[in-house]
């Protein structure tokens, strides 16, 4: 429990979200299970995003938090979220003390429009036990390290191209180009790499849209992910959906256009599947990014790696080496660019 509370704090690293850490501490003190606390936090965060992006009109969740009693909140909350996607509507046996309910009210003061939706992946990751992390090779990638990859691979190059663009015609071409770029994370987890790539491209596209008559927000359909965990894949889809909806609201406000109806398909192309047994050529992408799972000498890796390394004596290297080989094969067959955040060597145990 202490690890979960610390994990949420360390992964968020945002002083404005101290109140969220405080709520976690109180929920755990109320003897709620870690799984129930995690599910509730994800639902709570998603509800705030729904209010910020216009999915919930009239801020019904905020009104529920502010106007309900601690004893009645759990049942009324379940009624509110019944219409959400199935993963977000998961019921919990939640107990709230008056003190915990008061701590929740403080979250209503936060401007969630300014909070990165990758926080959802951080909450999910923080709740995983050490044994779960070892079993799946799952490791949280900080936003700093995410940008070490995507800035070098994608963003910096596009910024250079943007700075060299002079005429209105060239800017219009760049605007169209930014809308067609596709990004692929074959070990996407909660979606940090895809979310940050989307936000970077969307920000540049918003700047390039000046002078263009018909402007549309960036679609998530060109953001592809593979993930073995169904729960992590659901979180990735949900976070991408929230990200896209917040960006759509930003576009609507800047260009003074009506906010379009909710499109539930705007949640990326995220597939729950074993990436090493999947044919990557079924996905058309310009850039490959990510942090492959690391679990050296793990028994479950044998089948995938035995097939992948059938022509070599490399089956004893770490699971993450499979992603490196698959990425190399993928790039060799097509003109694509790849940068993965992995261990210093596929035989080492720490990432860098």
Positions of predicted regions on the chain:
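SAM-dependent methyltransferase catalytic region
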Residues: 132-343, 347
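Generic structural signal for hydrophobic core residues of well-folded globular domains
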Residues: 27, 44, 48-53, 68, ...
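Short helix-capping/linker segments at secondary-structure and domain boundaries
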Residues: 50-62, 133, 160
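Short, basic/polar, glycine-containing "phosphate-handling" surface segments that engage DNA
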Residues: 1-50, 54, 91-121, 130
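Ala/Thr-enriched low-complexity intrinsically disordered regions
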Residues: 350-351
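Extended, well-ordered alpha-helical scaffold/bundle regions in very large, multi-domain proteins
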Residues: 54-79, 190
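Class I S-adenosyl-L-methionine
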Residues: 84-172
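Non-catalytic, well-ordered alpha-helical scaffold segments
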Residues: 18, 35-43, 75-78, 101, ...
């Amino acid at each position: 429990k202490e690890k979960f509370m610390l994990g949420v704090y360390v992964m968020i690293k945002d002083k404005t979200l101290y109140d969220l850490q405080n709520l976690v501490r109180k929920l755990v003190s109320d003897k709620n299970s870690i799984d129930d606390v995690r599910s509730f936090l994800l639902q709570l965060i998603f509800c705030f995003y729904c209010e910020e992006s216009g999915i919930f009109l009239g801020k019904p969740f905020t009104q529920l938090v502010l106007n309900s009693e601690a004893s009645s909140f759990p049942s009324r909350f379940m009624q509110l979220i019944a219409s959400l996607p199935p993963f977000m509507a998961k019921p919990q046996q939640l107990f709230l003390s008056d003190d915990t309910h008061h701590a929740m009210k403080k979250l209503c003061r936060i401007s969630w429009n300014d909070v990165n939706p990758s926080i959802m992946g951080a909450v999910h990751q923080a709740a995983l036990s050490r044994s779960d992390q070892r079993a799946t090779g799952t490791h949280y990638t900080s936003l700093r390290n995410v940008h070490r990859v995507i800035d070098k691979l994608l963003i910096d190059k596009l910024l250079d191209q943007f700075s060299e663009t002079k005429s209105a015609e060239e800017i219009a071409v760049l605007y169209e180009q930014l809308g067609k770029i596709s990004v692929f994370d074959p070990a996407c987890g909660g979606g940090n790499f895809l979310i940050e790539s989307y936000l970077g491209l969307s920000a540049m596209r918003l700047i390039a849209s000046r002078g263009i008559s018909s402007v549309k927000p960036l679609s998530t359909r060109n953001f592809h992910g593979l993930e073995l965990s169904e729960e992590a894949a659901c979180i990735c889809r949900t976070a991408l959906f929230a990200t896209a909806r917040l960006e759509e609201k930003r576009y609507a406000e800047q260009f003074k256009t009506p906010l379009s109806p909710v499109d539930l398909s705007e949640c990326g192309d995220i597939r729950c599947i074993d990436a090493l047994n999947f044919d990557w050529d079924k996905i058309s992408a310009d850039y490959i990014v990510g942090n492959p799972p690391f679990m050296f000498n793990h028994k479950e890796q044998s089948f995938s790696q035995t097939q992948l390394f059938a022509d070599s004596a490399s089956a004893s290297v770490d699971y993450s080496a499979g992603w490196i080989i698959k990425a190399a094969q993928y790039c060799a067959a097509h003109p694509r660019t790849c940068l993965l955040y992995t261990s210093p060597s596929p035989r080492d145990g720490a990432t860098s």
